[in-house]
Swiss-Prot record:
Listed name of the protein: Compound eye opsin BCRH2
CDD domains: 7tmA_photoreceptors_insect
Sequence similarity: Belongs to the G-protein coupled receptor 1 family. Opsin subfamily.
GO molecular function terms noted in the UniProt entry: G protein-coupled receptor activity; photoreceptor activity
Highest taxon above the source species: Eukaryota
Membrane topology: Multi-pass membrane protein
Location(s) in or outside the cell: Membrane
UniProt KW keywords: Chromophore, Disulfide bond, G-protein coupled receptor, Glycoprotein, Membrane, Phosphoprotein, Photoreceptor protein, Receptor, Retinal protein, Sensory transduction, Transducer, Transmembrane, Transmembrane helix, Vision
GO CC term, one of those recorded: membrane
Organism whose genome encodes this protein: Hemigrapsus sanguineus (Asian shore crab)
Entries under InterPro entries matching the protein: GPCR_opsins (IPR050125), GPCR_Rhodpsn (IPR000276), GPCR_Rhodpsn_7TM (IPR017452), Opsin (IPR001760), Retinal_BS (IPR027430)
């Protein structure tokens, strides 16, 4: 069976078996000879997965790609169409949308083709490296743009008008820094530090976190620090202090109202409480989604590079990568389309979307800080 070729479905249930593969068939048996140098020896220990996994993952990736094109494309379109959205903060958001859009449009078509055309990598070895590099650049860039967005929100909400203002120039610099960090983290394998190889069920390519040598170990520790640990610290720091600042502000207002012998300084206390709850929930959702998407892949990579490859099966390796790529679908909705100003732009420029957002203005100065906080969060 070592020379088996063609779709894996043809071998599923062979040799008088109702389910599974004949004994001795490896997941690597279906890989073309010129691709095998890009397959780590670890995967030779596993039989192919049920072919239905390939079809299921192909359908899921097609869905993710469609949602990403719609969501991120809409954000980019509205940014270019509406002058009101072309703010410094939204420069970061539109770069996030661009990065996410590139990730899905450069990865999804090839992954789904592999899923439906044989269940293994069907393209050249060189494009395996390009595929992995593009996924790394856009993934890391999105992570750091989320850090920049989180820090901007922290600066606005915690420092208010006393903090340094985010100008268009600064926003462009922050976006460029994110792209430079991403490129700097993704290019080393082309120069001998680390490797890009096939991973999991061999439908896609990514970092090599299985080879046990100092070269691979040092590169993976480098990307773990710059792609996960530092961004996680910045995002958690930002949102923890955002929530603390909001509740401290509300406590100060209640104390001031008590000194003035009034029940509240607000015209509508119920609305204020709802705004506080919304801000806290938004912060919790932002942090939780980030960790849900990126932590499994980071832990699997760290487990492999530390030498413990037990339990890293083809599916265990593949599913965290799916979670990581799914962030490109929710980002445009969490960071842009859910915002009232984006919904207003949809109402104005795409009325057939049936989004009916009305422009509101508040004249109550006592609510200014919370209004800014609610918009930014």
């Amino acid at each position: 069976m070592t020379n088996a070729t063609g779709p894996q479905m043809a071998y599923y249930g062979a040799a008088s078996m109702d389910f599974g593969y004949p004994e001795g068939v490896s997941i690597v048996d279906f890989v073309r000879p010129e691709i095998k140098p890009y397959v780590h020896q670890h995967w030779y220990n596993y039989p192919p997965v049920n072919p239905m996994w390939h079809y299921l993952l192909g359908v899921i990736y097609l869905f993710l790609g469609t949602v990403s094109i719609f969501g991120n494309g809409l954000v980019i379109y509205l940014f270019n169409k509406s002058a009101a959205l072309r703010t410094p903060a939204n420069i970061l958001v539109v770069n996030l949308a661009l990065s996410d859009l590139i990730m899905l449009t450069t990865n999804v078509p090839f992954f789904t083709y592999n899923c439906f055309s044989g269940g293994v990598w069907m393209f050249s070895p060189q494009y395996c490296e390009i595929y992995a590099c593009l996924g790394a650049i856009t993934g890391v860039c999105s992570i750091w743009l989320l850090c920049m967005i989180s820090f901007d929100r922290y600066n606005i909400i915690c420092n208010g008008f006393n903090g340094p203002k985010l100008t268009t120039g600064k926003a462009v610099v922050f976006a460029l820094i994110s792209w430079v960090i991403a490129i700097g983290c993704a290019l080393p394998p082309f120069f001998g530090w680390g490797n890009y190889i096939l991973e999991g069920i061999l439908d896609s390519c990514s970092y090599d976190y299985l080879t046990q040598d100092f070269n691979t170990f040092s590169y993976n520790i480098f990307i773990f620090v710059f792609d996960y640990f530092l961004p996680a610290a910045i995002i958690v720091f930002s949102y923890v202090f955002i929530v603390k600042a909001i509740f401290a502000h509300e406590a100060a207002m209640r104390a001031q109202a008590k000194k003035m012998n009034v029940s509240t300084l607000r015209s509508n206390e119920a609305d204020a409480q709802r705004a506080e709850i919304r801000i806290a929930k938004t912060a919790l959702v932002n942090v939780s989604l980030w960790f849900i998407c990126w932590t499994p892949y980071a832990l699997i990579s760290l487990k492999g590079v530390m030498g413990d490859t037990s339990g890293i099966t083809p599916l265990v390796s593949t599913l965290p990568a799916l979670l990581a790529k799914s962030c490109s679908c929710y980002n445009p909705f969490v960071y842009a389309i859910s915002h009232p100003k984006y919904r207003l732009a949809i109402t104005q420029h795409l009325p057939w979307f049936c989004v009916h957002e009305t422009e509101t203005k508040s004249n109550d100065d006592s609510q200014s800080n919370s209004t800014v906080a609610q918009d930014k969060a």
